[in-house]
Structures are given as C-alpha cells and as structure tokens.
C-alpha cells in the first residue's frame, strides 16, 4: 500500500466502474461494504486501506457539476502520507496514473 495514513473522506463519482477500478485495482483499497440505495438511484462503496482508514465512494449518475477552480467550494485535493514520495510517484506512474511534479508547500515546507 502506498499510504501511511489518511482521515475518512467521502468522494462523489458518476462512473461506478471507473471509480472502483481506480481505488481498488490501481490504489489497492479493499471493498469493505457496498450498498445500492435504490430510492436514491446510487451506490455507496466503503473502501478500506490496510491501516483501517476509510473512503466512502458515492456513485451518483448525475452529480451536480463542480466549478473547476481549486478555490471553488468542495474537495480541493486529496493528500496521502507516504514513506518515499519518489518511489510512490513511480509506482503510480507505472499503473498509468498521471502525477504532478513534486512541490514544496510554502506554508508548511512539506513535499
């Protein structure tokens, strides 16, 4: 697994298969629970990392559009803590996941 820790987070997606492929097949999360909510016409997939951290994937066919600016309301980014950032980037790239260049946060000095 690529991560040491992350807090619980809920993420909305519109594509069940793509979301499940990305989080389960590429990042290595395990499906802990999957619920179809027929009354809402959606799914909730609870994913678990080896350290017990959870991600709830809400799969909605027509989620509201989000403004693309980073400053827009909603999730801005998802940050993972890793032992070796270069090694983790290399592993992600080998799985076909595009990454940005490694940056240093001017506020906290973290990469």
Please report, for each region that a protein language model flagged, where it lies by residue:
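Conserved active-site tyrosine of GNAT-family acetyltransferases
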Residues: 19-24, 92
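Short, conserved charged micro-motifs
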Residues: 18, 85-89
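Conserved short beta-strand elements that form part of the metal-binding/catalytic scaffold
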Residues: 30-69
């Amino acid at each position: 697994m690529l991560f040491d820790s992350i807090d619980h987070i809920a993420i909305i997606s519109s594509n069940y298969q793509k979301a499940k492929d990305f989080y389960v097949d590429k990042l290595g999360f395990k499906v802990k629970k999957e619920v179809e909510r027929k009354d809402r016409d959606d799914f909730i997939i609870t994913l678990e990392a080896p350290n017990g951290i959870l991600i709830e994937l809400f799969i909605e066919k027509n989620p509201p559009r989000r403004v693309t600016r980073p400053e827009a309301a909603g999730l801005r980014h998802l940050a993972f803590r890793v032992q070796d950032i270069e090694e983790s980037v290399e592993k992600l790239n080998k799985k076909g996941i595009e990454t940005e260049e490694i940056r240093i946060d001017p506020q906290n000095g973290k990469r």
